[in-house]
């Protein structure tokens, strides 16, 4: 993939979705050799649009290597919970694996006032225009520690537009 990436035009890719070889020495397959992550990121950064996303699959210890290889662009991790476990050949020596990590990287940042927000389009939202009220004197929130002019300290109303936001655990049915 490192060779092919050099042929692609700069800043032309919205999403890089890849299940890299983990290269952890756990298999004897020729293809399971760890890719030089410095070179990989050099290629990814050249290809990505400014607000592009990189999603990489992994399991430990490879997940930690991925995150540490580019902490500046690391944004969050999701867990893909699979319907069927894997690793039956080693089931006498370790637990079966029922999940895989998905590590998300971007030049964009997470935050409502970001100059370059990360692309994020939550799916499956349920529209609900519900008026909610902030009550700073409720028993669970005393208002202390929020700063003098913080909206959490005042009795305010706001509208919740959607419900059913996704979590960082993903489940997909085979249907």
Language model segments and positions:
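Core catalytic lobe of class I
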Residues: 1-175
């Amino acid at each position: 993939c490192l060779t092919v990436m050099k042929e692609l035009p700069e800043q032309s890719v919205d999403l890089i979705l890849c299940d890299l070889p983990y290269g952890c020495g756990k298999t004897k397959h020729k293809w399971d050799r760890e890719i030089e992550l410095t070179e990989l990121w050099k290629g990814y950064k050249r290809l990505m649009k400014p607000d592009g996303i990189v999603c990489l699959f992994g399991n430990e210890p490879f997940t930690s290597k991925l995150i540490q290889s580019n902490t500046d662009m690391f944004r969050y991790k999701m867990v893909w919970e699979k319907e069927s476990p894997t690793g039956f050949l080693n089931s006498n020596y370790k637990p079966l694996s029922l999940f895989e990590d998905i590590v998300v990287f971007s030049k964009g940042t997470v935050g409502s006032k970001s100059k370059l927000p990360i692309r994020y389009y939550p799916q499956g939202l349920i529209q609900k225009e519900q008026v909610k009220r902030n009550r700073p004197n409720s028993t669970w929130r005393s208002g202390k520690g929020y700063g003098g002019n913080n909206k959490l300290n005042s009795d305010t109303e706001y509208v919740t537009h959607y419900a059913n936001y996704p979590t960082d655990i993903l489940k997909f049915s085979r249907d």
